[in-house]
Amino acid sequence: MRINQIFNVEAARSKSTEDYGMGNVPFVTNTEINNGVVKYVEPLEKDKVFCGPAICISGLGYATVHLGKFLPKGNGGDSCTVLTPLREMSNYEILYYAALFNVSHGWRFTFGRKSNTTRIKNLELSPVFSESPLDMTSEIDNNNSIITTLLLKKEEELKK
């Protein structure tokens, strides 16, 4: 199934990293480190702030998942492209499609050939989540349980 049959495909609209003061909104760029976030900014009036769940694809073709508000880099040839679901999706499903994009299409984009809405919208994402042979749900639930237990234990230690 084509990406534009699963997601609304939009170009980011913002300025360069240096144009922003410190704030509370994650600024997402081309880095693969820290889920693409390079700093937290105060958006400018003409910026397009997105609200997740959404997938942000960097100009270099790396997909990251964002569940809350975020500001993707949107100027020049290395702008981000944002995929917002056309229908309600679980976080597992969003994560699945981001990983599928990275495995299937990440190789297509480089410094010489940046990603953009035109290049992304007609790419295929197959198999779709409902036909996937993977069951990430139980693994993610197990990991969440382990982390929750560790966090609660640490919280109790800090109370002492």
List each language-model region with its residue ranges.
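Short, structured motif recognition centered on aromatic/hydrophobic residues
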Residues: 1-7, 28, 80, 94-103
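Non-catalytic DNA-recognition/assembly elements of restriction-modification systems
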Residues: 1-13, 17-35, 130-160
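A short, aromatic/hydrophobic, helix- or strand-capping loop or linear motif
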Residues: 17, 110-111
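Structural beta-strand/beta-sheet cores of well-ordered domains, especially the beta-sheet scaffolds
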Residues: 23-28, 53-55, 79-81, 121
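A short beta-sheet element
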Residues: 40-99
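A short glycine-rich beta-alpha junction/loop motif
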Residues: 73-81, 111-135
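Extended, Lys/Arg-rich, non-catalytic nucleic-acid recognition/anchoring regions
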Residues: 107
